[in-house]
C-alpha cells in the first residue's frame, strides 16, 4: 500500500508524530513524504528516511500531481500553512483517494473550511474535541491521536514539589494570567519554564512581585530531561488557542507529572479532573489547585500514577498506526475520484487566508508584523507582492 503524505514540512509536532508512527507501521505500507518547502529542521525527516520512508521536496505542483497519481492514498497533513493552500487550489490533481489529517482543532481560529471537509474522502482530527464542529458527516470523519508519551516509567514525587511549563511561551497560546497565578501562590515555589519567551511573556515575568520564583530556560531538544526535574505540570492555555494533541501535556503526564490545566476543549479530552490531574474553570482558580497539590503528597502520588497509566494505555504510536492502516485499507475499496479542492478554499492567497478566519473576520487594530504561522504577514511573506493580500493589508 503506497501512501503519499503531502505536507508543508516535517518540523514540530507533525514531524515528531510521523517519525513515531512510521516506526510502528507494518512492512507492507510504504510512505512517501512530499514536502512543499525545503526543510529547515531535518531531524524528523532524517528519522523517517532512516526508517525506510521516502522523503522529498516537491519540485513543482506538477510534481505533486504526478506522485499523487502513483499513490494508493494521498494524505494531506493539514493546517493553515500558505503553501498547503496553494497546493490544494492550484494543483491539477488526478483521480485519487484523499485523507486529511488536521493538526489544528478548527474550534477556534484558524478554522477549517467546511467545504474542504466535505471534499475529502476522509477527514481525520487529532482530538475528540473537534467532533463538536457542526455539520460533520460521521462516515467521513475520524480521530487519530498525534501526541505520545515517553517510554520511561514515572519517578517518585519529591517532598518539596517543583513546577514546570514546557511549550509556547507567548499569550498566543500560554494564558496571559500564568505569571499572576504563580505570583498569587501563598507558598514559595520554583517554576521552570521551557520554551522561547516572547516579549510579552518576558515583561510579565519581570513585572511579578515574586519574580525569583520563575526560571526561564529557553527551548530544549531534550524535553524528557527538562520535565523530569519537576513534579507538577502547570499548563494553562488561553481559551481560544490553536492546539490539538498537546504533545507537551501528554509527555509530562507519561512520566508522572501531575497536570493543572484549564477546561479548554483539547486539554479536557486529555486530563480527567481528580483522576489524572486537576482542571480549573478559570485562571483565578489555579493558585488554589496548585497549593492543594503542593501540600498533599499523597494526592500527587495518586494522580501521578493515574496520569502515567492513562497515557500508556491510550496514546501510543502503535495505536495511531493501527488506526491509520485500518482507515487506509477501508478507503481502498472506494473508487478514486478527481477532487475540486479549489472550490473549497478559493482561488487567491487572500481567499486562502480568509478561509481560516470565518465570516466575521475584520482587520486587526494593531497589525501583526511578525510572520507567525498562518498570519496575514506569513501569507504575504510567502506570496510577496500578491495583489489580493495587499488589498487585505491596506484594509487594516
Where on the chain are the PLM-derived regions?
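Donor nucleotide-sugar binding/catalytic pocket of nucleotide-sugar-dependent glycosyltransferases
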Residues: 119-153
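Nucleotide-activated donor-binding/catalytic signature segment of Leloir-type glycosyltransferases, i.e.
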Residues: 50, 202-220
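C-terminal amphipathic helix plus adjacent low-complexity
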Residues: 313, 318-396
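Glycosyltransferase donor-sugar binding loop
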Residues: 33-41, 190-203
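Conserved acidic donor-binding segment of nucleotide-sugar-dependent glycosyltransferases
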Residues: 273-274, 278-284, 292-297
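Short hydrophobic beta-strand element within catalytic cores of glycosyltransferases
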Residues: 34-35, 257-262
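Nucleotide-sugar-dependent
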Residues: 236-250, 262-264, 268-269
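Conserved donor-binding/catalytic core segment of Leloir-type glycosyltransferases
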Residues: 4-6, 152-173, 179-186, 192
Amino acid at each position: 500500500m503506497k501512501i503519499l503524505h503531502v505536507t508543508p514540512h516535517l518540523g514540530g509536532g507533525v514531524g515528531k508524530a510521523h517519525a513515531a508512527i512510521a516506526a510502528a507501521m507494518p512492512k507492507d505500507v510504504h510512505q512517501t513524504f512530499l514536502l512543499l518547502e525545503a526543510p529547515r529542521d531535518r531531524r524528523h525527516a532524517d528519522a523517517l528516511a532512516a526508517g525506510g520512508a521516502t522523503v522529498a521536496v516537491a519540485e513543482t505542483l506538477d510534481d505533486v500531481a504526478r506522485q499523487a497519481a502513483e499513490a494508493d492514498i494521498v494524505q494531506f497533513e493539514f493546517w493553515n500553512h500558505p503553501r498547503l493552500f496553494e497546493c490544494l487550489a492550484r494543483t491539477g490533481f488526478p483521480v485519487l483517494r484523499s485523507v486529511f489529517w488536521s493538526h489544528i482543532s478548527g474550534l477556534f481560529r484558524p478554522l477549517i473550511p467546511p467545504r474542504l471537509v466535505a471534499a475529502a474522502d476522509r477527514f481525520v482530527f487529532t482530538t475528540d474535541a473537534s467532533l463538536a464542529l457542526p455539520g460533520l458527516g460521521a462516515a467521513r470523519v475520524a480521530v487519530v491521536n498525534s501526541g505520545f508519551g515517553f517510554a520511561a516509567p514515572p519517578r517518585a514525587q519529591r517532598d518539596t514539589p517543583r513546577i514546570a511549563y514546557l511549550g509556547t511561551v507567548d499569550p498566543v497560546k500560554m494564558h496571559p494570567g500564568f505569571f499572576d497565578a504563580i505570583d498569587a501562590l501563598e507558598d514559595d515555589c520554583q517554576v521552570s519554564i521551557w520554551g522561547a519567551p516572547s516579549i510579552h511573556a518576558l515583561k510579565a515575568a519581570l513585572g511579578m512581585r515574586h519574580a525569583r520564583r520563575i526560571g526561564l530556560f529557553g527551548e530544549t531538544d531534550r524535553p524528557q530531561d527538562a520535565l523530569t526535574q519537576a513534579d507538577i505540570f502547570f499548563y494553562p492555555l488561553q481559551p481560544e488557542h490553536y492546539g490539538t494533541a498537546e504533545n507537551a501535556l501528554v509527555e509530562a503526564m507519561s512520566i508522572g507529572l501531575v497536570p493543572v490545566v484549564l477546561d479548554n476543549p483539547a486539554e479536557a479530552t486529555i486530563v480527567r479532573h481528580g483522576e489524572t490531574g486537576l482542571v480549573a474553570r478559570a485562571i483565578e482558580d489555579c493558585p488554589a489547585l496548585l497549593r492543594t497539590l503542593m501540600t498533599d503528597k499523597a494526592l500527587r502520588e495518586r494522580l501521578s500514577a493515574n496520569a502515567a497509566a492513562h497515557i500508556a494505555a491510550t496514546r501510543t504510536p502503535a495505536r495511531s498506526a493501527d488506526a491509520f492502516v485500518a482507515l487506509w485499507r477501508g478507503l481502498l475499496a472506494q473508487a478514486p475520484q478527481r477532487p475540486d479542492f479549489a472550490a473549497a478554499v478559493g482561488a487567491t492567497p487572500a481567499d486562502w487566508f480568509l478561509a481560516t478566519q470565518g465570516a466575521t473576520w475584520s482587520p486587526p487594530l494593531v497589525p501583526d508584523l511578525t510572520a507567525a504561522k498562518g498570519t496575514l504577514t506569513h501569507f504575504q511573506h510567502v506570496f510577496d507582492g500578491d495583489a489580493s493580500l495587499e488589498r487585505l493589508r491596506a484594509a487594516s
